Structure formats: C-alpha cells, structure tokens
Amino acid sequence: MTGSIRSSTAGIDVRQLGSVDYQTAWQMQRDLADARVAGGPDTLLLLQHPAVYTAGRRTEPHERPGPVFAGAAGAEAIDVVDTDRGGKITWHGPGQLVGYPIIGLAQPLDVVNYVRRLEESLIKVCLDLGLETGRVEGRSGVWIPAGSGRPERKIAAIGVRVSRATTLHGFALNCDCDLAAFTAIVPCGISDAGVTSLSAELGRTVGVEEVRGAVADAVCNALDGALPVRDHPGARVASST
C-alpha cells in the first residue's frame, strides 16, 4: 500500500469548515464529486455537524434509535438520515471532527486500500497525541485495544461510498463529543465493544480545533503514500462485524 492512491497529481483542496447541517454537507459532497468527475480537484472537507444519526445501507431496524431520543431532559430529538454510504448507523455532532474526502481514485480501484489509508492517518494523529490505537480485523475504523477490564473502544468511524471512481462520505474522529448519544443506537452495528473519544482516553479536553490541522496533513499524506499503511499490534480477529 505504497504510492499515491489518487488519479490526480495536483494537491488536495482542504476546506476547513465550521458546523454544517448534514444534508447540506451531503449535497456539497455530491456537487464536488460531480465537479471531480468533470476534471475538478480532489477535495477534503473537515467540519462538524449538529447532532444527527446517519444510517448506512446495512443498518438493521433494531440498531436504530427509538422514535425520540433527546439525550438529556428538554433537549430536542435527534434526526435519523438514511444515507447511501456503506456500513451501519452512527452519530455525528459537536465535538466530533468529520472528514469527507472527495477523491478520484487511481485504477485499478482498491476501496479496502483507501479505507486502510484513512485509518492510518487517524492512527497517526492519535499516536502523536500520546494515544496508542490500531485496527480490529473484520471491523473498519480506529480502535483502542481492550485492557484493564475494558472492552475494545472505537474512537473513529469510517463509512465510504465510491461512485464513478470518486469517493464520498468518509470518517468521524471523536474528540470531545457527548458519548451518551451513542447509547440510543447499536453504533456501526457492533454490540460487543464501546465508543470513546480523545478527551475520555487522554484525560483532558481535546477539541476539534486542536487536531484539525494534523488530521488534514495526515489524510493527505496517507492518500499520497507519504504516510505508509502499517500493521499495528494488538488487533484481534472480530467475532462479528
């Protein structure tokens, strides 16, 4: 998994946005993908969303939240949006850095390679903050190993779609978000592991602003091959996905 996975040799246009409604960001992705197919640049969107659940194509009915989940007394219910990405259901919201790479992939297409590069970029960001993470075989995303009586915990989720050799959707890194919202769903369809954040693991507040630049650099380097994909010890063979 060396060398660039992109079909273009031009730089990636990184756009660091603020809080963007999910449906607005989804349409932005589609517009950028159309532009990329027409010869436009590769783009990386980095942003946050107001609280929302997004359900991938493989989401089962029992994995969804109930008709209303307020999270806290008096809070507004959280919408559920059905999407065309892979994977199952997850939550997005304040304190979580979401990245949408709109990238033209080189031939032959290798979506697994692409996902591994996204994982590698986030593993590096976590390591640079002093947090060891890795992969779990059979499950996408970035994980904290089990230990000290605690199960494996997902710190970053990945769900993508590739159409016309162009990527949409992407990754979500939990920085300083409210993890309670995950309790209303079966996150990513996985019931035997937990969800965590940089702040929860490092014992200090790690905001989106602190990691956004590092994530942009790491993702661009991983896609271009400057950050090679490596094996990370501690992964186990998952019993289910």
From Swiss-Prot:
It holds the Pfam family LplA-B_cat. It comes from the Bacteria. InterPro entries: aa-tRNA-synth_II/BPL/LPL (IPR045864), BPL_LPL_catalytic (IPR004143), Octanoyltransferase (IPR000544), Octanoyltransferase_CS (IPR020605). Belongs to the LipB family. Substrate binds at residues 85-92, 157-159, 170-172. The keyword Transferase applies. It comes from Mycobacterium marinum (strain ATCC BAA-535 / M). Its EC number is 2.3.1.181. In the reaction, the free carboxyl group of octanoic acid is attached via an amide linkage to the epsilon-amino group of a specific lysine residue of lipoyl domains of lipoate-dependent enzymes. The keyword Aminoacyl-tRNA synthetase does not apply. Pathway: Protein modification; protein lipoylation via endogenous pathway; protein N(6)-(lipoyl)lysine from octanoyl-[acyl-carrier-protein]: step 1/2. The active site is at residue 188. GO terms for cellular component: cytoplasm. GO terms for biological process: protein modification process. GO terms for molecular function: lipoyl(octanoyl) transferase activity. This is Octanoyltransferase. It is found in: Cytoplasm. Gene3D superfamilies: Bira Bifunctional Protein, Domain 2. Catalyzes the transfer of endogenously produced octanoic acid from octanoyl-acyl-carrier-protein onto the lipoyl domains of lipoate-dependent enzymes. Lipoyl-ACP can also act as a substrate although octanoyl-ACP is likely to be the physiological substrate. The record marks 154 as: Lowers pKa of active site Cys. It catalyses: octanoyl-[ACP] + L-lysyl-[protein] = N(6)-octanoyl-L-lysyl-[protein] + holo-[ACP] + H(+). Keywords: Acyltransferase, Cytoplasm, Transferase.
